[in-house]
């Protein structure tokens, strides 16, 4: 699948800004966050992306929300292994620069959405879901090991993630959080939106010709 041309042009100009082993760095942040929260659970509140707290000088929150563990039990071991496969696939498919750009766009989108709608972000899950969506779009049949033994195709993981996020917002979230979610997905929209737009245009044209 071809990515938008502007991404390749950007890589030629500032490709040196890539972060090698970005996936490993993010997993390490999750490990550190897990250890900290495990020892002092109250610290988790200091890691949230809270717009009002950031404006009061707690700048670290712009980065530390990425380290908030998705769970506080042994399941994190399986999750870290799972994330390793996720980032490895994207790094092989895209290279370090595109993966770095995808991360930065999602990170900035999450921060902007949080500030615009004044919604605290207490999890890495919003950003993580966009990686599921990316792999499911690039190769929906790609399989990863879940719990070290169970092979699951990425299209089902992405679908499950999308359903969970939708249900959370539909039944428990406010409209501000829903819009914040869209901002968090800006990386996916910018990377794959043009492809879907071209596909829809060609499909509409084909159907008109067949009428």
Question: Whereabouts are the PLM-identified features?
Answer:
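A detector for small-residue-rich transmembrane helices and their helix-helix packing motifs
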Residues: 1-211
């Amino acid at each position: 699948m071809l990515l938008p041309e502007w991404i390749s042009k950007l890589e030629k100009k500032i490709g040196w800004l890539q972060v090698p082993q970005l996936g490993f760095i993010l997993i390490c942040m999750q490990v550190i966050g897990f250890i900290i929260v495990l020892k002092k659970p109250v610290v988790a509140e200091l890691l949230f992306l809270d717009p009002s707290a950031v404006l009061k000088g707690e700048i670290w929150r712009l980065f530390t929300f990425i380290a908030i563990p998705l769970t506080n039990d042994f399941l994190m071991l399986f999750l870290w292994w799972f994330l390793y496969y996720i980032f490895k696939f994207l790094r092989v498919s895209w290279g370090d620069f595109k993966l770095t750009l995808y991360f930065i766009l999602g990170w900035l989108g999450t921060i902007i959405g949080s500030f615009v709608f004044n919604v605290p972000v207490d999890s890495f899950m919003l950003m993580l879901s966009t990686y599921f969506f990316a792999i499911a779009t690039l190769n929906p049949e790609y399989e990863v090991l879940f719990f070290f033994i169970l092979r699951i195709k990425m299209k089902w993981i992405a679908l499950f993630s999308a359903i969970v996020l939708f249900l959370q917002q539909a039944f428990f979230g406010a409209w501000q959080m829903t819009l914040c979610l869209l901002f968090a997905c800006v990386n996916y929209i910018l990377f794959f939106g043009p492809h879907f737009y071209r596909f829809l245009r060609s499909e509409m044209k084909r159907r008109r010709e067949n009428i």
